[in-house]
Amino acid sequence: MRTQPVQIQDSIGRILCNPVFRSSGKKIFSKGHVMSEDDIRVLTGEGLNKIWVSQLDAGEMPEDQAVTSVATGIACGSLEIRVTSGGRANLIATEDCCLLIDDDLLKQINCTAAVVVATGVNFSHVKTGQRVATVKSAPFAVSSSQLETVTSLLRDRGPLLQARPIRKPTIGAVYADACNGDRARGQFEHVMKQRLERFGASPDYTVNCRETEFAIARSIQHLLRAKPTAILIASTVTPAGPEDAVGQAMARAGCQIERFLAPVEPGSLFLLGYKDDTPIISAPGCFRSAKPNVVDLILPPLLARYRVTGWEVACLGHGGLLA
């Protein structure tokens, strides 16, 4: 790309390097504006003779075209692309959803120097109309060879961002304590409703029971018949892992235990399992507080019907210190 001052009459089709103002201070054209014949008449009428312009060389792509190309390739799901002036494309959620980010691929793309991409946080919950990512290029033009590096990465690895919709999730809740579950319900019910409302969900099916392996297993099996999006187990006893009453009950109900312990504070004593495609969570004791904890990090992808793995739980440690 070449940048130089030229006579006004020689600027047709070239790109303004700087904004142009009237003597009164009012802007006539913005930086990045492509000059036309009508524009020349306007500037001549303002008494201007020369302006600084850029001209693309062979093998370069205009900035807006470049960011549109990258924005189209980096994402999938419930999104739309909105191109703004100055070589920027924003990705906007078209419905409530959960973001899934390939962090390694994002880093590779941001090392190409052709464009940069900024995204929301992996597993974050986003609302309709919220910006979830932005793509920005260097001013005016991008090298086609650098852009090809980016598109090649995307062809090989797939999109780096998914916006998985969260559509009418249903939740099953088990309240368990040493007696009949009433005390557990009293401690957890209000905050559970409050927490789920943040994600457009509610405890649709609830069961009270004693905290024994058999009683909790029966409660899980009962809730599974309703085919909820997820099941939360709230107990007055601090979780102790797969060998405690809740963990044994999950196994008895046919669950595969995916992960015990999360590198998140508060909420490290967290147990996740699956019965077929239904996630079942033994909530940590901090769940009774409305303050952010591990459940807030895990719920969005589960409500979007994404199967969170033990490895992905382990990766929550970076940024997992919530309080």
Model-identified regions with their sequence ranges:
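Structural motif
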Residues: 14, 18, 27, 49-52, ...
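Extended, charged alpha/beta regions that create polyanion-binding interfaces
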Residues: 57-166
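Residue-level "contact hotspot" at macromolecular interaction interfaces
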Residues: 28, 34, 122-125, 263
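Flexible, glycine/charged-enriched surface loops at secondary-structure junctions
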Residues: 53, 79-84, 142-144, 202-206, ...
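Short glycine/threonine-rich loop/turn motifs
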Residues: 204-323
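Short, low-complexity N-terminal leaders and the immediately following helix N-cap/first helix
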Residues: 1-86
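Phosphate-binding glycine-rich loops and their immediate beta-loop-alpha structural context
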Residues: 128, 139-230
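Generic secondary-structure signature for well-ordered alpha-helical cores
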Residues: 45-49, 72-79, 128-137, 197, ...
